[in-house]
Amino acid sequence: SEGQLMRIVITGASGNVGTALLRRLAAAGSAHDLVGVVRRPPEPAGPYESVHWHSLDVAGADAADRLRPIVAGADAVVHLAWGFQPTRNTDYLSRVGVGGTAAILDAAHAESVGHLLHMSSVGTYAAGRYGCRVDESWSTSGIASSPYSRDKSAAEAVLDRYEHEHRGTGVAITRMRPGFIVQRGAASGQMRYFLPGYIPMSVITHLPVLPLDRRLCIPIVHADDVADAFARALDRGAAGAFNLAAEPPVSRDDVADALGARAVHLPSAVLGRLVDLSWRARLQPIDRGWSDMAFSVPLLDCGRARTELGWQPRWSAA
């Protein structure tokens, strides 16, 4: 409940949003008992210093059993753990994303945890409304050609089945559905997912032209604002789904301006084929699904987050 000190378990607590959430909770002056679950615990400094760390891979077959003593006695579990690489090992990524979600939910239910907050994504939404805003009732069947989107959709289906089976009893579930998450401090880490190791980061900021479809129109949100939404939902015990995005949406010209490049129209279908060919040739590590998702996902109506959480993004997408 609001203002009450809680024991909070956070999976993926050292990642982009996890780090932002630790900073947000510290800035609020709270003395919550924070527990981090990650594969490789970070050095106990800065935002990581006051966290009790556990090393655990949520993709493991025994993850649910190993998570039970960790979540025992917790007031809430924030599930942020997700895998992005290697994109060629989709089985492992599914075990992290879908299997990990099932494991943390099983453990939370077994230990009677009251609240699970799950990091979903705009990627869980179906195509069909590109460039238009949708609320949380839009289909969560995902983008079929994107492994990331399929897994985000499947993870929500795990939550759907649980809620259907328990019908208002058991763990209360919150689903955050942010747009594409950005954070200046994590930019090199994010770009490393999408670039081969032999390409220096400086290349990205020295592109003379940006070949991209002029239709590009995607929702983005800053990691700090996503963390703020999680903190507000924790305080309020708010359940349900919440869209999170900054305004305005990001266009192709916005991306070109940010990179100091000249935008050149390249149809998304052609871009998708180029991404796929270069991925198959192992020239770069991003699969075509990311390109397909960027030209399929809708924009986000965030009225529910504003009304129920009092959430307002501090960072503009401009």
What are the residue ranges of the model-derived segments?
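Alpha-helical substrate-binding/gating segment
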Residues: Y198-P249
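Mid/C-terminal beta-alpha module of Rossmann-like enzyme folds, strongest
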Residues: A227-R288, C302
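NAD(P)H-binding glycine-rich loop region in Rossmannoid oxidoreductase-like domains
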Residues: S55-G99, A107, A127
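N-terminal Rossmann NAD(P)H-binding glycine-rich loop of SDR-like oxidoreductase domains
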Residues: I8-S30
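Conserved Rossmann-fold NAD(P)-dependent oxidoreductase catalytic core, especially the SDR/UDP-sugar
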Residues: G99, A103-Y148
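C-terminal amphipathic/interface module of NAD(P)-dependent oxidoreductases
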Residues: R262-H265, I286-A318
